[in-house]
Amino acid sequence: MIIWLAELLQPYLSFFRLFEYLSFRAILSVLTALGLSLWMGPIMIKRLQMLQIGQVVRNEGPESHFSKRGTPTMGGIMILAAISITILLWTDLSNPYVWAVLTVLLGYGAVGFVDDYRKVVRKNTDGLIARWKYFWQSLIAFVVAFALYAYGKDTAATQLVVPFFKDVMPQLGLMYIILTYFVIVGTSNAVNLTDGLDGLAIMPTVLVAAGFAVIAWATGNVNFSEYLHIPYLPHASELVVVCTAIVGAGLGFLWFNTYPAQVFMGDVGSLALGGALGTIAVLVRQELVLVIMGGVFVMETLSVILQVGSYKLRGQRIFRMAPIHHHYELKGWPEPRVIVRFWIISMVLVLIGLATLKVR
């Protein structure tokens, strides 16, 4: 929005030329989102407490979690508000990639909101019925996938980039739609599964978003994309501002979500952030790098799949409890130790993911 205003005022005030620079808008984006989150945090927490919107804790969960019962939840609303306002302020709103991310972010946020509302306000522990949750997730993902396919059909925007191989970029055709669907829905639910400890999901989300900011910048730059042997996608550069908005809003939320948490993001936050990360990965054609950088999310999801599969097939559990962060809690690890070690793993994986751009 402001970039349009800057274009109008440039002939009269040269200062507004600064807003043409992607790096300048990226810095303003992270600072704006961070400031909004820090400002909204106390207001949101107080409001949630007044409305008695508190976390529901399963009786079969770790005993250490019983103290979390009643902690304000649905704090993801302030994350989405901070990201959305920042995007509307600092991005080029004529860019279709920006609207693709916003559609998934707010659409999945709405699904998560209904789920949280039913759990916390209506006191329905099951929340939104699973089949309806997946229906709305699938509908949003397919709409975005079809739109992106129609927009970039048979171009670099629908190629599959394989890490470590510079000349392996097959054209996906209609398989692009299927891949996009699974990446968006899968990442959304993976982040949701990871959101089980204070700050556990938000920091890896921030790190992955920061990694994708670097990738989006390289993908949207003709010289660097050619140098790194990745597709040149001119619209991708604007995703740098989107990614930095996620980083800023996430860090602001972490201020209140760090152990011991004053607020939880709820499904309204985790489903939306995961969906946004998946969409960004698709747009910059780095779905496979997402598997590396988002390895913590993958690990959490696989632990649930393996646990359920093993119990149904063999009648035995592999882990003491799934997702895997609960396994380590039940082994006696203090919650902060689990959280920080998962953060460290995430940081290393993001660096490895970025290294794949050069190691080809």
From Swiss-Prot:
Belongs to the glycosyltransferase 4 family. MraY subfamily. The lineage of its organism: Bacteria, Pseudomonadati, Pseudomonadota, Gammaproteobacteria, Vibrionales. One of its GO terms (biological process) is regulation of cell shape. Keywords: Cell cycle, Cell division, Cell inner membrane, Cell membrane, Cell shape, Cell wall biogenesis/degradation, Magnesium, Membrane, Metal-binding, Peptidoglycan synthesis, Transferase, Transmembrane, Transmembrane helix. GO terms for cellular component: plasma membrane. It is found in: Cell inner membrane. Its cofactor is Mg(2+). It comes from Vibrio parahaemolyticus serotype O3:K6 (strain RIMD 2210633). Its EC number is 2.7.8.13. Its main location: membrane. The keyword NAD does not apply. It is a multi-pass membrane protein. Pfam families: Glycos_transf_4, MraY_sig1. The chain crosses the membrane at residues 26-46, 70-90, 94-114, 132-152, 168-188, 199-219, 236-256, 263-283, 288-308, 338-358. The gene is mraY. Catalyzes the initial step of the lipid cycle reactions in the biosynthesis of the cell wall peptidoglycan: transfers peptidoglycan precursor phospho-MurNAc-pentapeptide from UDP-MurNAc-pentapeptide onto the lipid carrier undecaprenyl phosphate, yielding undecaprenyl-pyrophosphoryl-MurNAc-pentapeptide, known as lipid I. This is Phospho-N-acetylmuramoyl-pentapeptide-transferase. It catalyses: UDP-N-acetyl-alpha-D-muramoyl-L-alanyl-gamma-D-glutamyl-meso-2,6-diaminopimeloyl-D-alanyl-D-alanine + di-trans,octa-cis-undecaprenyl phosphate = di-trans,octa-cis-undecaprenyl diphospho-N-acetyl-alpha-D-muramoyl-L-alanyl-D-glutamyl-meso-2,6-diaminopimeloyl-D-alanyl-D-alanine + UMP. Pathway: Cell wall biogenesis; peptidoglycan biosynthesis. The keyword Cell membrane applies. One of its GO terms (molecular function) is phospho-N-acetylmuramoyl-pentapeptide-transferase activity.
